[in-house]
UniProtKB/Swiss-Prot annotation:
Name assigned to this protein: N-acetyltransferase 9-like protein
Keyword set includes Signal: no
Keyword flag Cytoplasm: no
Sequence ranges assigned to domain N-acetyltransferase in this UniProt record: 34-201
């Protein structure tokens, strides 16, 4: 979605940046993993198809995609190379986080997805922070079109299910035919306060008009 095409969101542990062409090669390499494709319900693509995906997502008015950077790793790489570079950006990539708007009859429903592709970056709270930040972004900047969030998680992925439940997502119904559990978060004042998004000093949005 073009609305986030020049937006960088900085948190305590992660930095969210728009999915650009420079990120495609590493993203494509992640998706060569059968495990990751299974977890994300993704098809195996050629690198040319992945470039087409990136361009399509950029133009899609119903999808917001951010690449997740490990903030400490980025700062470490910048220190080693005496400043910021595209190479440091790529080295610090650990996954992605998305909001989808186009799949539901219920207007205002947005589906969240998060992937931590780098095994060494898992179980460190990075996915949780990325989800909190993108939800805060949605509540702050997309409040007119985002009334509630949902996630679909494989029933065997208990760590992810428990993470979302701890963020005040509630299970809706039982396991579906795809062996997925549906969880929902209503954008009410109490829920937003529980996430502590409004008063989070580690959350800020920066706009870079010509960021590449």
């Amino acid at each position: 979605m073009k609305i986030n095409s020049n937006t960088i969101i900085i948190g305590k542990k992660v930095i969210l940046v728009p999915y650009k062409k420079k990120h495609v090669e590493k993203y494509w390499k992640w998706m060569q993993s059968e495990e990751i494709r299974e977890q994300t319900a993704s098809e195996e693509l050629t690198i040319e198809e992945e470039f087409e995906n990136q361009e399509s997502w950029f133009k899609d008015d119903h999808k917001i995609t951010f690449i997740i950077l490990d903030k400490d790793l980025l700062l470490e790489n910048e220190k080693d190379s005496n400043g910021y570079s595209n190479e440091n950006d790529i080295k610090s990539m650990i996954g992605d986080v998305n909001i989808f708007f186009n799949q539901y009859e219920d207007e205002g429903t947005a589906e969240l997805e998060v992937m931590i592709a780098e095994p060494t970056s898992r179980r460190k709270g990075l996915a949780r922070e990325a989800i909190s930040i993108i939800m805060g972004y949605g509540i702050e900047h997309l409040s007119t079109i985002t009334k509630k969030y949902i996630v679909k998680i494989g029933e065997s992925n208990q760590p992810s299910i428990q993470m979302f439940k701890s963020m005040n997502f509630k299970q809706i119904g039982s396991v579906n035919v795809f062996k997925e559990i549906l969880l929902e978060f209503e954008n009410g004042e109490n829920n937003i306060n529980l996430l502590n998004l409004k008063n989070n000093d580690n959350y800020k949005s920066l706009i870079f008009k010509n960021w590449e």
